[in-house]
């Protein structure tokens, strides 16, 4: 059973989403106009990361700051000695098309320390950082738990392993956290339920509480695009499942995308949101063409489908990923077994950080992260990227087109390495 009983209902939903999107776009434009009322402005922002660069005559720092409304980059000759700063910026050349993306460059003329109480996100970040001596490990775990930006060097390290999507908080993390906490809570509360409230649907209420907590986590992460998409899909799926409606469908993916874009127009320009939606699309595509309810009764078939699905998604995502991040390595294929290792590693590492011993595996982790080198480069043109996305959409209609996606991804992967 589907959420919309006819096309008219779906059309009304789309019209509502367009209206909300238009309203939010207008509000963003008003915010942009207010921000540009003066040729310069002072912004209260948190310093997310710094990257030292070599210029023609001297070295400088590229700084990334996060304010309440957006993230911006600037340059400085020296590294600011503050985590919460007041940044004087020049706004006269800022365009709305850049402002609406939520990430842009602003020239700065002054950076000073701001004496304010740290936000919860900063407190958590400092708690994580304090448990690690190595700066790269500080970045890694901050990115893993709080979706903070990674330096160019660390980003290259995780790209060589093909695990950027594992580090970036997404639906994978939501699933791991949800399943882990759900089963712990279920087996802890079940004896009490049997004795005191046997009439309650324990799974429903545990799931409801977990989604509320995940919503608070999403707020702490400042609505990270990939996690936002997965959260919307999770909530929609939960509501559909509780009412006996179909969960795994392309319509529900479209539903989540439309809701996300309606309330946050910036997602139109988010690569992370695009990757997140495309990854789920490929999962649904495999289920659509190869899914069979009878296979759920066999553990062997479940494991077989899981492995094939992992391989298919890895190959199908190659062309979109390489268009934006062209570095290729033979080690990237190890992301398939590493995904299963991560299911154990993620809750264990989180548990260790809760007890202040998060740096227990740092020596091993730093050697592992830096082990994989870059071995090739995939140079893709815009027309190839657009053409591949069109083929991906057509794969809904034919199974052989879906298989073609994997073959094209395999071809690009091998060609980049030979």
Show the residue positions of the predicted features.
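Solvent-exposed, charged interface segments at domain starts and junctions
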Residues: 18, 141-144, 183-187, 324, ...
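Charged, low-complexity, helix/coiled-coil-prone segments
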Residues: 24-34, 84-86, 117-127, 153-154, ...
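Internal transmembrane alpha-helical bundles of multi-pass membrane proteins
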Residues: 223-418
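Membrane-interface helix/helix-cap signal primarily in integral membrane proteins
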Residues: 2-165
């Amino acid at each position: 059973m589907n959420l919309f009983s006819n096309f008219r209902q779906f059309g009304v939903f789309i019209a509502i989403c367009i209206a909300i999107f238009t309203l939010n776009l207008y509000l963003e434009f008003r915010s942009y106009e207010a921000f540009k009322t003066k040729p310069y402005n002072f912004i209260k922002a948190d310093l997310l990361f710094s990257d030292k660069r070599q210029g023609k005559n001297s070295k400088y720092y590229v700084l990334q700051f996060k304010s309440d409304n957006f993230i911006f980059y600037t340059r400085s000759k020296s590294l600011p000695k503050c985590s919460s700063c007041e940044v004087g910026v020049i706004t006269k050349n800022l365009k709305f098309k850049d402002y609406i993306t939520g990430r842009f460059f602003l020239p700065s003329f002054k950076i000073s320390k701001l004496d304010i109480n740290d936000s919860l996100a900063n407190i958590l970040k400092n708690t994580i950082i304090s448990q690690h001596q190595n700066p790269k490990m500080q970045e890694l775990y901050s990115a893993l738990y709080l979706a903070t930006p990674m330096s160019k060097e660390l980003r290259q390290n995780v790209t060589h392993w093909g695990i950027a999507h594992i580090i970036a908080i997404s639906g994978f993390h939501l699933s791991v956290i949800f399943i882990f906490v759900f089963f712990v809570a279920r087996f802890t509360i079940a004896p009490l339920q049997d004795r005191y409230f046997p009439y309650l649907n324990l799974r429903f209420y545990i799931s409801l509480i977990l989604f509320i907590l995940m919503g608070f986590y999403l707020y702490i992460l400042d609505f990270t695009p990939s996690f936002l998409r997965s959260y919307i899909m999770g909530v929609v799926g939960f509501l559909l499942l509780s009412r006996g409606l179909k969960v795994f469908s392309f319509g529900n993916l479209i539903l989540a995308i439309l809701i996300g874009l309606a309330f946050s127009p910036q997602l139109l320009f988010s690569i992370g949101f695009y990757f997140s939606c495309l990854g789920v699309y490929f999962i649904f595509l495999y289920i659509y063409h190869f899914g069979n309810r009878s296979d759920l009764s066999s553990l062997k078939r479940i494991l077989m489908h899981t492995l094939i699905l992992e391989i298919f998604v890895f190959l199908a995502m190659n062309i979109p990923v390489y268009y934006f991040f062209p570095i290729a390595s033979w080690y990237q294929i190890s992301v398939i077994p590493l995904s299963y290792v991560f299911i154990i590693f993620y809750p264990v590492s989180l548990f260790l950080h809760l007890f202040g011993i998060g740096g227990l595996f740092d020596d091993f982790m730093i050697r592992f992260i830096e082990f994989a080198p870059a071995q090739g480069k995939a140079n893709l043109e815009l027309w190839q990227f657009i053409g591949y996305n069109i083929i991906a959409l057509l794969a809904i209609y034919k199974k052989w087109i879906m298989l073609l996606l994997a073959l094209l991804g395999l071809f690009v992967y091998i060609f980049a390495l030979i």
